[in-house]
Amino acid sequence: MAVEAHHLNPLFSSNREMIHPVEASGVVYNTQMRYGTVPTFNPTVECQTSLFNPIYNISPVDRLVHQSMKPTIQSVDSSLTFNSDNNVDFLRPVSSRKRSREESVVLNPSAYMQIQKNPTDPLMFLGQDLSSNVQQHHFDIDRLISNHVERMRMEIEEKRKTQGRRIVEAVEQGLMKTLRAKDDEINHIGKLNLFLEEKVKSLCVENQIWRDVAQSNEATVNALRSNLQQVLAAVERNRWEEPPTVADDAQSCCGSNDEGDSEEERWKLAGEAQDTKKMCRVGMSMCRSCGKGEASVLLLPCRHMCLCSVCGSSLNTCPICKSPKTASLHVNLSS
């Protein structure tokens, strides 16, 4: 809030000493003199001061000198007197040449400034007391200064609060960014963990499936091995049992012609039967596809051993039962 101060002429404040009234005293300074007033003649004071005062008011230094000398003059005793028409004044010369303590006030700047700062006389100008106006002017200036100081203090406090809020907001924004980044990283790691857990579960299931397949294949291999051993044992057994059967057949065949066949014919028939058996055995051991290679491939699941190694890798069906081939085993019959 702005306050208007009463503006005075700078002459009033700069020439304050000029407009002080003359103090009332018994000497020449006691005259109620104003600007350019001639003092009354007093023979008692004539020996101490000049006849006339300056055209303006008494200077502060002269007034201080008068105030300092006044008690000194009154305190000195003397027997000399001077008679005038109306009164008798005692002339009391200074008994001591030492400077009194009061006189040192004039030469002490600090005391002079203290007196100037604390004037007790009213401020007069053209017969009007301006002390209240000057005091009001000083109060207005002090109020303006205090208002300005308070406003500056409030502005500084507001700026400090604003700066503090900005700093707090900047720190909060940085922390929020860091927290968001950490949250995103945590979410990403959580998703990755879920994916890895699902992957581990699927791998465990797949491992169990392959384990079951391996166990089933192992059981199939064991069954095929046992079947193959049985087939090989049967073939080996048939190989050792075939010649007596052929001899018996030849003997029975020869025994049916006892009347007109000779011994030579019996042996001839036995040889032909043997050749026929050999041809049948050779036909059974040859490849049913090409007819050239030896049958050494066992087809599954029909279990027919009717293909050679070359045809077994190229054909997908059994030439005997025409069933599709799912697997094949190579059998080594060499002894």
UniProtKB/Swiss-Prot annotation:
Domain of life per record? Eukaryota
* Annotated segments matching region WRD domain: 196-232
Expression induction per the record is: Down-regulated by pathogen, salicylic acid and 1-aminocyclopropane-1-carboxylic acid (ACC). Up-regulated by salt, gibberellic acid and methyl jasmonate.
Catalyses which reaction? Answer: S-ubiquitinyl-[E2 ubiquitin-conjugating enzyme]-L-cysteine + [acceptor protein]-L-lysine = [E2 ubiquitin-conjugating enzyme]-L-cysteine + N(6)-ubiquitinyl-[acceptor protein]-L-lysine
Instruction: Tell me if Metal-binding is a UniProt keyword of this record.
Output: yes
Its annotated pathway reads: Protein degradation; proteasomal ubiquitin-dependent pathway
CC per GO annotation: nucleus
Q: Name one GO biological process term.
A: defense response
Q: What is its EC number?
A: 2.3.2.27
Which Gene Ontology MF annotations are present? transferase activity; zinc ion binding
Q: Tell me yes or no: is Glycosyltransferase among this UniProt entry's keywords.
A: no
Q: Zn fingers (RING-type): where?
A: 287-322
Q: Which UniProt keywords apply?
A: Metal-binding, Plant defense, Transferase, Ubl conjugation pathway, Zinc, Zinc-finger
Q: How is loss of this gene reflected in the phenotype of the organism?
A: No visible phenotype. Decreased resistance to B.cinerea and increased cell death upon pathogen infection. Boi, brg1, brg2 and brg3 quadruple mutant shows a higher GA signaling resulting in a higher seed germination in the presence of paclobutrazol, precocious juvenile-to-adult phase transition and early flowering.
The domain comment in this protein's record states: The RING-type zinc finger domain mediates binding to an E2 ubiquitin-conjugating enzyme.
Q: What does this protein do?
A: Probable E3 ubiquitin-protein ligase. Has no effect on the stability of the DELLA proteins.
Subunit architecture: Interacts with the DELLA proteins GAI, RGA, RGL1, RGL2 and RGL3.
**PANTHER family for this protein:** BOI-RELATED E3 UBIQUITIN-PROTEIN LIGASE 3-RELATED, SBP (S-RIBONUCLEASE BINDING PROTEIN) FAMILY PROTEIN
Name under which the protein is recorded = Probable BOI-related E3 ubiquitin-protein ligase 3
The organism's taxonomy opens as:
Eukaryota, Viridiplantae, Streptophyta, Embryophyta, Tracheophyta
Supply the gene name. BRG3
